Amino acid sequence: ENYTPKILDILQQKHVPATFFVIGLNIENNIPLVKRIYNEGHEIGNHTFTHPNLEITSDDRERIELRSTRLLLESILGYSTVLFRPPYNTDAEPKNLYQMRSLAVANNEDFISVTSFIDPNDWEEGVEADSIVARAIKNQKAGNIILLHDAGGNRSETVKALSQIIDYFQKHGYTFVTVSELMGKSRNQVMPPVQKQLQFTEKLDYIFFFITFIWEHFLHGFFLVAILLIIFRLLFVALMAVLQHKKEKKQENQPGEFLPLVSVIVP
């Protein structure tokens, strides 16, 4: 939400297409942004719903993750996706049986797994834009897909690095394309439109998700206002207490102001 719009602005300015692999939870919380990604000509892939480590996730859990995210995309955009990028280490190259198993599950769900070898590790804490650019350039011969992150933490350095990465590779004869074009396919082939007989159901799903989106943002704003009012009330009470304390102190220090009653008893 904080960095994706800035990245989209840069891509639009540079006339560069990209493929965004999105998490279901982020889709649910950023419906207008997901629409913007698609409407500006980019592609969207599945990155599971909650970003679990698929090496230690059951097959059934993975299927639910993939299907939920796909259903959410279909209900919002009217288009599905066959592109899938697994979370964590599996996104580069499977190195063990568990990683292979997770890719097999995705394949059985009719997904095409997309991996990446040019990974500048922009997610590392404290990494600077210059380092991200240098790593991308250093590994340019390792593959043909550059992996960058727009969520999951502070991505301000990624935003700074993006323009430099684009400028360098274009200057050296590279052309940026989407994953579908890299595969020799069209966007509609990797993001096929929802079948007509399912469109009514998808519209109902969209209405439900949109109401949920509005409600969550309303609650967020409501609680924020409530917290601010509580803080304001506490500050007001504290201020009044300080003023009252000063007033009482001032009265104590003024001689002759206080004249208590005196009773005289004559036997």
Each model region followed by its residue ranges:
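Active-site beta->alpha N-cap acidic-glycine motif
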Residues: E1-T81, P86
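Hydrophobic beta-strand scaffold residues
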Residues: A18, I44, I112-S113, F176
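Catalytic domains of cell-wall/extracellular-matrix polysaccharide-remodeling enzymes
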Residues: E28, P52-Y168, Y174-T175, E181, ...
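Short beta-strand/turn micro-motifs at beta-sheet edges
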Residues: P32-L33, E40-H42, A134-R135, K250-Q254
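Juxtamembrane amphipathic/hinge helix adjacent to a transmembrane helix
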Residues: H172-F210
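N-terminal membrane-anchoring/stem segments of glycan-assembly enzymes
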Residues: Q195-F258
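Cell-envelope/extracellular polymer assembly enzymes that use nucleotide-activated donors
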Residues: P260-S263
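Active-site beta-to-alpha loop of glycosyltransferases that engages the nucleotide-sugar donor
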Residues: V266-P267
